[in-house]
Amino acid sequence: GFGCPNDYPCHRHCKSIPGRYGGYCGGXHRLRCTC
């Protein structure tokens, strides 16, 4: 979700959440956006 497996859209999504500074793609196929 949120653009994964591309880290950039996920990172931008996480930065939009108050208190979060970014995120990355994780999970078996890097399909989960982790903030």
From Swiss-Prot:
GO terms for biological process: defense response to bacterium. Disulfide bonds join 4-25, 10-33, 14-35. Keywords: Antibiotic, Antimicrobial, Defensin, Disulfide bond, Secreted. GO terms for cellular component: extracellular region. It is found in: Secreted. InterPro entries: Defensin_invertebrate/fungal, Scorpion_toxin-like_sf. Pfam families: Defensin_2. Its main location: secreted. It comes from the Eukaryota. Gene3D superfamilies: Knottin, scorpion toxin-like. SUPFAM superfamilies: Scorpion toxin-like. Has antibacterial activity against M.luteus and E.coli. Belongs to the invertebrate defensin family. Type 2 subfamily. This is Defensin-B. It comes from Mytilus edulis (Blue mussel). The lineage of its organism: Eukaryota, Metazoa, Spiralia, Lophotrochozoa, Mollusca.
